[in-house]
């Protein structure tokens, strides 16, 4: 079997069913935070299971630019913090990582000195005003391109004051940026969300000794420094989603993902799979370093359409491209609402998935905040413009399994390396191989 290309075009032509037991790479959200919180700490942080992908490499380079030392010791990555974070000597390039840029904006607001945060062409199109505006309420001196809407972001760090923030949209990145700024602020910083977003920041800061107060949808902190410690990163459910959704919809499939993070703020996908009729089983449920994990098995069954909205959306926002593919194979109508956040990801994922699935034969109607998909519908081969978005590329690679043997051609798969460099190899492992063209 020839290796799938790591950049350039790829022609996907696989056969199902999907069968096997796999492990997916470490959770991206937890990996970012492990490095960043380690750099903020008073002591050493040792991380196992850290995601080895471009987005996390961006955070690693950033914390090194701020004075932290990051070294590989066998299966562990060790973060040694500086006595105090220093002003970076150059622009910090966050690559494609919105998490890096937004969380660093919060941290650097309280670090004396001048910092400039930028990224690749995709990241420079992603909005930053919803981070900048609440940080300014805390006294942060920030500016950005296009009327403070878009990166690069210029941060002039200085004294901050605590504030109470009411977020209009649940966002773990915005919440985390404000809480991290709160670690440098005078007085209490509180964040209230309309729905609960992923809570890795709260769990990890608590695990490192920071008093984090949670009351319903409100989270608050005061000035503090984490103590460091040990972090064991579970598998990323957002990466597993492509295999779980494919297995649920493709007859004869059964896939087990071992050591998968099942934090309740991230398991909206499992709820949706069950609601649609998939056979979902969890084994060896345990908690390690404050994060629950399990071996998750999904077996194909006849799927029924469902409605996905409200508090479920923040719990599966990154999994929705895979869910949209699965919905094309479910009987009846699947409706997704309250997902406007999809329009400001690495691409406008609603528009991208809607347009691409429609060309592949799906019956799909787009709304400003979601879509409706009627099924089941046999799909056909299609050429896909990935738009530098890893989740579009991976979702459409799985969609090819429902194309009756016709190929799906991805125009450039380099973006997959931002979160899941081994994706195509693992997909080959549980299905049949792709035929491809591109860089080896």
Curated annotation (Swiss-Prot):
Q: Name one GO biological process term.
A: amino acid biosynthetic process
Q: Name one GO molecular function term.
A: 3-phosphoshikimate 1-carboxyvinyltransferase activity
Q: Where is the active site?
A: 318
Q: Which Pfam families does the record associate with it?
A: EPSP_synthase
Question: Which Gene3D superfamilies does the UniProt entry name for this protein?
Answer: Enolpyruvate transferase domain
The UniProt record lists the EC number as 2.5.1.19
UniProt entry keywords in alphabetical sequence = Amino-acid biosynthesis, Aromatic amino acid biosynthesis, Cytoplasm, Transferase
> Chief location of this protein?
cytoplasm
Question: Where on this chain does 3-phosphoshikimate bind?
Answer: 28-29, 33, 171, 173, 318, 345
| PROSITE patterns given in the database record | EPSP_SYNTHASE_1, EPSP_SYNTHASE_2
InterPro entries assigned: Enolpyruvate_Tfrase_dom (IPR001986), Enolpyruvate_Tfrase_sf (IPR036968), EPSP_synthase (IPR006264), EPSP_synthase_CS (IPR023193), RNA3'P_cycl/enolpyr_Trfase_a/b (IPR013792)
**Positions of phosphoenolpyruvate binding:** 28, 98, 126, 173, 349, 391
Statement: the UniProt record of this protein carries the keyword Cell cycle: no
Task: Report the subcellular localization.
Answer: Cytoplasm
So what does this thing catalyse? 3-phosphoshikimate + phosphoenolpyruvate = 5-O-(1-carboxyvinyl)-3-phosphoshikimate + phosphate
Q: Where is it found, in Gene Ontology cellular component terms?
A: cytoplasm
Describe which pathway this protein belongs to, using the record's wording.
Metabolic intermediate biosynthesis; chorismate biosynthesis; chorismate from D-erythrose 4-phosphate and phosphoenolpyruvate: step 6/7
Family note: Belongs to the EPSP synthase family.
Give the quaternary structure: Monomer.
Function summary = Catalyzes the transfer of the enolpyruvyl moiety of phosphoenolpyruvate (PEP) to the 5-hydroxyl of shikimate-3-phosphate (S3P) to produce enolpyruvyl shikimate-3-phosphate and inorganic phosphate.
The molecule here is called: 3-phosphoshikimate 1-carboxyvinyltransferase
Taxonomic lineage of this organism? Bacteria, Pseudomonadati, Myxococcota, Myxococcia, Myxococcales
UniProt lists the gene as aroA
């Amino acid at each position: 079997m020839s290796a799938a290309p790591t950049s350039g075009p790829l022609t996907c032509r696989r056969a199902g069913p999907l069968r096997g037991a796999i492990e997916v790479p470490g959770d991206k959200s937890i990996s970012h935070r492990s490095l960043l919180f380690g750099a903020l700490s008073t002591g050493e942080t040792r991380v196992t299971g850290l995601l080895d992908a471009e987005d996390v490499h961006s955070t690693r380079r950033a914390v090194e630019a701020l004075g932290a030392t990051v070294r590989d010791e066998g299966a562990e990555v060790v973060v040694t913090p500086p006595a105090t974070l220093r002003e970076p000597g150059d622009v910090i390039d966050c690559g494609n990582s919105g998490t890096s840029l937004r969380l660093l904006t919060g941290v650097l607001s309280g670090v004396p000195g001048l910092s400039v945060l930028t990224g690749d062409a995709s990241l420079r199109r992603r909005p930053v005003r919803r981070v900048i505006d609440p940080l300014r309420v805390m006294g942060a001196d920030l500016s950005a391109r296009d009327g403070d809407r878009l990166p690069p972001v210029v941060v002039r760090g200085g004294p901050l004051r605590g504030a109470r923030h009411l977020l209009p949209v649940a966002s773990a990145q915005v919440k985390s940026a404000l809480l991290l700024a709160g670690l440098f602020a005078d007085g209490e910083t509180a964040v209230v969300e309309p729905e609960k977003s992923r809570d890795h920041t709260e769990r990890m800061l608590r695990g490192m000794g920071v008093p984090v107060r949670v009351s319903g949808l409100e989270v608050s902190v005061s000035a503090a420094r984490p103590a460091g410690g040990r972090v064991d990163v579970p598998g990323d459910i957002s990466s597993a989603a492509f295999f779980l959704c494919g297995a649920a919809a493709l007859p004869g499939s059964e896939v087990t993902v071992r050591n998968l993070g099942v934090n309740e703020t991230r398991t909206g996908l499992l709820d949706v799979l069950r609601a649609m009729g998939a056979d979902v089983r969890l084994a060896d449920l345990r908690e390690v370093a404050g994060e629950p994990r399990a071996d998750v098995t999904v077996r194909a069954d006849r799927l029924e359409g469902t409605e996905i909205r409200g508090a479920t959306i923040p719990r599966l926002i990154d999994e929705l491209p895979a869910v949209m593919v699965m919905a094309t194979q479910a009987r009846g109508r699947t409706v997704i609402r309250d997902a406007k956040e999809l329009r400001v990801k690495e691409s406008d994922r609603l528009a991208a998935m809607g347009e691409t699935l429609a060309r592949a034969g799906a019956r799909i109607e787009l709304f400003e905040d979601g879509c409706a998909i009627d099924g089941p519908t046999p799909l056909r081969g299609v050429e896909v413009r990935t738009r530098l978005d890893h989740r579009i590329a991976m979702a459409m690679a799985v969609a090819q399994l429902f194309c009756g043997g016709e190929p799906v051609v991805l125009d450039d798969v380099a973006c997959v390396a931002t979160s899941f460099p081994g994706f195509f190899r693992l997909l080959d492992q549980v299905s049949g191989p792709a035929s491809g063209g591109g860089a080896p």
